[in-house]
Amino acid sequence: MKKIFISFCRGGDNIIEQVIKTNLKSDFIHVEIITVEQDMENGLRNDRVYDFAENNGKDGKKKWFLEDRLKETKSYVDNINEIFELKIPEGKFYEVYKYIENYYKNYSYDKAMRIYKIGDLGVGNKEFIKGSPDRTTTICSHFCFKVIRFIVRNYYKDYDLLNYRVEEIENHYREKLEYITPGHLYNVFREHTELFG
């Protein structure tokens, strides 16, 4: 089995996550990519979670084993995340996997992103947040958008609305240097069942 998932993570009850939820005007405070690669006949598995966040060490990124992430992360333990399979054509798993690995290798989390930069003077902005002029930095939702963009551009060229949505978000970043938020990413793509399984 070879699959790729996107996990939209709901915030919990602690004070920091409550503040983030209030500022983003969304329950979703984080989003991650999960790759599942299993060969059941030979007992081999390489299941990973790709995570960009401020508390993930010097570069603000971490590649977890899925089993560890599921056990250690409250939103997974409490089963409050929304998880979708990203539908890719048969035989294209490794193309997308390679893109994810290269992106993870070449980009770091934008540690200039702080709560006070969300919206204007901390006032919520549910769709976009101030981005980084350094093209080697990212946040979790921008990383996940880039994976979606890669899939749409390569395997969904004939889907006009999907391509329009991707172009709109890409242009917004180019023109205003603002990243899409996890909640807005969810709202834009959740109804595209051709992509989100």
Question: Where in this protein do the model-derived segments appear?
Answer:
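Structural alpha-beta junctions
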Residues: 27-30, 106-107, 153
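A structural motif
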Residues: 72-76, 87-123
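Donor-binding and catalytic core of enzymes assembling or modifying cell-surface/extracellular glycoconjugates
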Residues: 1-28, 172-175, 181-192, 196-197
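Activation targets extended, charge/polar-rich intrinsically disordered C-terminal tails
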Residues: 112-197
